[in-house]
Amino acid sequence: MNTSLQDLEQEILAAVRHEVVPALGCTEPICVALAAAIGRTHLSSAPEKIAVRVSGNLMKNAMGVTVPGTGMVGLSIAAAVGAIGGDAEAGLQTLKSISAEDVAAAKKMLADDAVSVSMADTDHIFYAEVTLTAGAEIARVCIADTHTNVVLIEKNGKTIYQKPVAAADEKNPVAVFTKITAKDVFDFATTVDLEKIRFIKEAATLNSALSQEGLRTDYGLHIGRSLQKNIGNGLLSDDLLNRIIIETGAASDARMGGASLPAMSNSGSGNQGIAATMPVVVVARHLKSSEEKTIRALFLSHALAIYIHAKLPTLSSLCAANTAAMGSAGACAWLFSERFEAVSDTICSMIGDVSGMICDGAANSCAMKVISSITSGYKSMLMALDNTRVTGFEGIVEHDLERSINNLCALARESMQHVDQQIIDIMVQKPMH
């Protein structure tokens, strides 16, 4: 490892630890559940009414996803069950201990029309505000910019916590990834002391358990189980690509379908964590890779996913499971070849293939997009292993990996922001019955 990377070692490790964390349930509704749980701690009795206001992008990512343990979709049930049974100290695992009684009480609040959800007029791409009323008491909690970043707590109109301006503008936890290149990420992952990155094994443990749950039970669109059945009836072969698709898709099915198991997330998203983890797990098993090589590949995958996502808005109209799959495809290329050129060629070909995939909100159909992304990754990896790739003469892809990634992310930051608004407009206007 070169000297400059050694100097940044602690920052890189801290950034990956910050971005790769367990999360129970899709993180947008869970963010609202967390705000409600925090608000409840400032009331002397259970809330009688809850009002939720969120940014358009958060609304988009919460309309169609099942809240774990409830069997219901949307922000209303997330807020109600968070207020009644959520753990205010558990972050993205705030719903880990909810009971059947909590869920029943939350559903009664919805039946009594005691929970309202509306769009907030805010400049924040990511914003959630939950106001709880119990008798004469009112508690209000605001989360902004990231899923657990509480910026304001009020009780009865008086501020009892406000994140200081200095803290609100504190250094971006992934800022280190703006100082380095993809080649630096590769060099770091393949040479850093193994014990310092061993923690990434938990991603394989958690997301593999989620995958097995998705293969045992019908969740969401149960794509993983459907494809598995088609191996049994001869319509699909039991090859490496289909094993990657089935095991990764099943984890996403369970994640989006409300399984009460945590995913190891990446950049605030369980699906991104799944897309960055499961292909590596399956390929490492296929190749009978050593523990060290598997750990390094997992770290490389997650670090590349963070590296690309650091150039994107927190939420956008670009499907970020796709960019996370670029990390895992690159890591799988390394497992096969141990060459950075194969990693680079794989990612460039993916950018030339599926970079236009839109995000139209978190939903069961995310599993299909995860599968499409990792299928592109597998094709691109095989091309790279055969020393071919989408070239710099084609579309937004350039000869250089860094410039190709920057071009993709520029689309998401700029022109696709207009696409995002139209997606939100369509989603909030369509009939839901």
From Swiss-Prot:
GO biological process: L-cysteine catabolic process to pyruvate
Pfam families: SDH_alpha
Transmembrane segments: none
Single Gene Ontology MF annotation: L-cysteine desulfhydrase activity
HAMAP family (UniProt xref): UPF0597
Family according to the record: Belongs to the UPF0597 family.
Protein name per Swiss-Prot or TrEMBL: UPF0597 protein DNO_0106
Species this chain originates from: Dichelobacter nodosus (strain VCS1703A)
Organism lineage: Bacteria, Pseudomonadati, Pseudomonadota, Gammaproteobacteria, Cardiobacteriales
